[in-house]
C-alpha cells in the first residue's frame, strides 16, 4: 500500500510538473494596449520579454502621435503591430480633424489594426471624461468602414456594468443589431464588455462573429477597483462558470491587457500575466493556446512565434 501511494504521488507530481512547464512555455499576444509619453518603447519590449508576450497590438494616446506607434513597429517588426489611433479630442468633439486623421493613418499603409472605439465610457474621476454615443454615430461608422476595408477586427468599448435599466437594454439591443448587421466582420468587446457570464454566453450563441477581449477581467484589476470590472477568476483560477464557457467556446476569447497608464506598464503588467498564465494552465493546452495567442493571430493575421 505504501509503495502504491508513493507511485501515485510521483505520478501526480509528474503531471503537475508537466502542467507547470506548459504554463511557463505558453506565450501571449496582447491584442490591445496603448502607450503615452510617459512610457518608452524600450520599456514596453522589456516588459513583454519578462512576461512572455511575443507581440503587442499598440496604439498611441496622450501626447504621443500615431506615428510613434509606427516608429516602434518599424523598430520591432516581429513584436509590435501599430494600431490606428481613434480617441482623443477630435474624436470626443466629433471634429472634422478626427476623420482626416483616421483616413491619413489608414491610407499610410503602416498600421495593422484599428484601436478601440469608445461608445460608452464612464467617467473616470478627473482622468477620463464620459463618452456616450450610439453605434450608428458617424465616428463609429467611419472607423468601421476602414476596418472592413482593411480586414481588421473592430474593437468596441461599451462598459455595460456602468449602464442601468432602459439605457443598458438599449445598448445591448444596439450591440446585437450592430454585430448581426456587420457579419462576418469580427466584433471584439474590450474588457469583456463588462458583461456577466450569462450575457456573454447569450451573445456568443446569437452571433458567430462576436469576440471578447480579456483586458481587466481579472483580480489584479478588481483589487481596490473604483470601476465595475468583470472578474472571471477566484484567486488565480477561473470561476467555474467562466471556465466552462471559455472551454466550450475557446475561439471567442482573446487575451488583451489594454495598458493605458504608465503604472499599468510599470507596476501591474507582470501581475496580470502571472494570474492569466495560472488560470490558463487549468485549461486544455489547445484552449489555453487559442486564448493566449492563437485567436489574435488568426483574426489579425499575425505570424505565430517561431
Regions found by a protein language model. Name each.
Residues 8-17:
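Bacterial N-terminal signal peptides
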Residues 31-34, 59-61, 83-87, 116-120, ...:
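Active-site-proximal beta-strand/loop segments in catalytic clefts of secreted hydrolases
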Residues 36-38, 63-66, 89, 120-123, ...:
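Active-site environment of divalent metal-dependent phosphoester hydrolases
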Residues 24-142, 146:
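Mid-domain alpha/beta scaffold segments of enzyme catalytic cores
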Residues 2-4, 26-27, 42-55, 59-60, ...:
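Mid-to-C-terminal alpha-helical segments outside catalytic/metal-binding sites
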Residues 18-23:
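Sec/Tat signal peptide C-region and signal peptidase I cleavage site
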Residues 32, 48, 114, 147, ...:
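Conserved, mostly hydrophobic/aromatic
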Residues 74-78, 84, 130-254:
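Catalytic pocket-lining loop regions of alpha/beta-barrel enzymes
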Amino acid at each position: 500500500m505504501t509503495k502504491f501511494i508513493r507511485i501515485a504521488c510521483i505520478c501526480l507530481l509528474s503531471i503537475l510538473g508537466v502542467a507547470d512547464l506548459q504554463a511557463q512555455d505558453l506565450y501571449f499576444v496582447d491584442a490591445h494596449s496603448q502607450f503615452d509619453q510617459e512610457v518608452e518603447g524600450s520599456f514596453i519590449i522589456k516588459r513583454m520579454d519578462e512576461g512572455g508576450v511575443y507581440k503587442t497590438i499598440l496604439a498611441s494616446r496622450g501626447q504621443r502621435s500615431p506615428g510613434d506607434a509606427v516608429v516602434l513597429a518599424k523598430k520591432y517588426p516581429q513584436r509590435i503591430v501599430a494600431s490606428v489611433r481613434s480617441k482623443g479630442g477630435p474624436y470626443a468633439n466629433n471634429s472634422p480633424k478626427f476623420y482626416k486623421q483616421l483616413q491619413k493613418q489608414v491610407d499610410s499603409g503602416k498600421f495593422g489594426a484599428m484601436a478601440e472605439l469608445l461608445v460608452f465610457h464612464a467617467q473616470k474621476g478627473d482622468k477620463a471624461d464620459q463618452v456616450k454615443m450610439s453605434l450608428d454615430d458617424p465616428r463609429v461608422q467611419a472607423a468601421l468602414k476602414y476596418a472592413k476595408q482593411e480586414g481588421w477586427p473592430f474593437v468596441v468599448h461599451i462598459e455595460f456594468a456602468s449602464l442601468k435599466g432602459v439605457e443598458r437594454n438599449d445598448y445591448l439591443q444596439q450591440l446585437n443589431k450592430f454585430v448581426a448587421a456587420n457579419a462576418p466582420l469580427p466584433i471584439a468587446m474590450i474588457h469583456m464588455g463588462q458583461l456577466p457570464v450569462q450575457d456573454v454566453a447569450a451573445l456568443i450563441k446569437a452571433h458567430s462573429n462576436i469576440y471578447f477581449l480579456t483586458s481587466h477581467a481579472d483580480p489584479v484589476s478588481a483589487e481596490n477597483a473604483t470601476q465595475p470590472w468583470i472578474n472571471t477568476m477566484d484567486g488565480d483560477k477561473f470561476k467555474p462558470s467562466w471556465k466552462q464557457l471559455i472551454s466550450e467556446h475557446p475561439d471567442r476569447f482573446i487575451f488583451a491587457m489594454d495598458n493605458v497608464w504608465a503604472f499599468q506598464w510599470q507596476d501591474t503588467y507582470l501581475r496580470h500575466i502571472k494570474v492569466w498564465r495560472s488560470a490558463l494552465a487549468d485549461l486544455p493546452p489547445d484552449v489555453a493556446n487559442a486564448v493566449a495567442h492563437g485567436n489574435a493571430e488568426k483574426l489579425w493575421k499575425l505570424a505565430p512565434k517561431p
